[in-house]
Amino acid sequence: VEYSNAGKPVVFLEQDVDYPMGKREDRWWAAYASGGTVYLPLVMVDSGHQISSGSKADFKAAYRTLVDAELTRPPQAQIEAYARQVGTKMRVYARVINAAGQPLSTARNDATLYALIWEDARVGVTGRIVRAAPWTGISPEVASGGEFTATLETANLTSVNWNALHAVVFADYRPGTGSAYDMLQGALAKPAALTADPDSVTVALDANTLEDRGVSVRLVGPYVLSWTAVADVPWVSVTPDSGPISVQPTIEVRSGMLSPGWQHGAVTFTASSEDGLSVAQTIAVSAFSGPRVV
């Protein structure tokens, strides 16, 4: 149930076919789209691009064929996902950029965003059991290149090991006139946090220069965050000094306020959301002022 292909880890997530969660089992049947009897296990890669059922002489070889075919396909979306525990629930923040080359919406092509929450626990056969599968329709319509954001939340999760819980977020849609669905892309959810790139700034300025030095910073985190920046030394400023996570700041070193030699400071970015998420990230700033060396 696990192997690596071209450096890409592959895992299979399991859920009870008699107690399905979310829409995953529905997607299998939509891809099957024929009569007759099927036998367990029902296996699906993507949202139905490749399916299998029943016993196999060599399960690993059969499923490897399904997965290898999927790994050759280019993604049709970009997804950023973050997750955190809120009481006995898991909350997932997702941001999707539509790269499918066509509009996406529930009304147009049943486009849907999901989270699968699984626990590393041997309940069935794989050692990875799905505990929740919240989803939401993509609405209003998202044009090609457009963005969709959503927060998904599970019901109360009891009798689980929170240290063994993980979340994957993906989007799918029905691409044609048939019944089968196609997955646009998936992404593992990261812990809900704020990160900054670069995580430190060092500049050296000619003592006679009158120009300030600016360094662009990329802040990354859940789409719900808004941030504020505070510098702990007067020779550092941040422009802008606050904004939503989509707004990227610049750290400015004020040359006219530097003393000769090295000096050190820091900028702390504090971010929060209306639903109670609060995170922070500090960037160390070092500056040298002195004669130019040639």
Name each model-derived stretch:
Residues 146-152, 213, 247-251:
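Short strand-edge motifs at loop-to-beta-strand transitions and within beta-strands
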Residues 277-290:
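C-terminal edge beta-strand
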Residues 191-220, 255-260, 289-294:
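Beta-sheet-dominated interaction scaffolds and their linkers
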Residues 1-7:
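Typically the conserved alpha-helix immediately C-terminal to a functionally engaged Cys/Sec
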Residues 215, 259-275, 283:
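A short beta-strand micro-motif common to beta-rich folds, especially ectodomain repeats
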Residues 7-191:
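Short, conserved sequence motifs used for protein processing/export or organelle targeting and
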Residues 193-200, 220-251:
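Surface-exposed binding patches on compact interaction domains or structured appendages
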Residues 170-174, 254-256, 270-274:
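Beta-strand-rich extracellular modules
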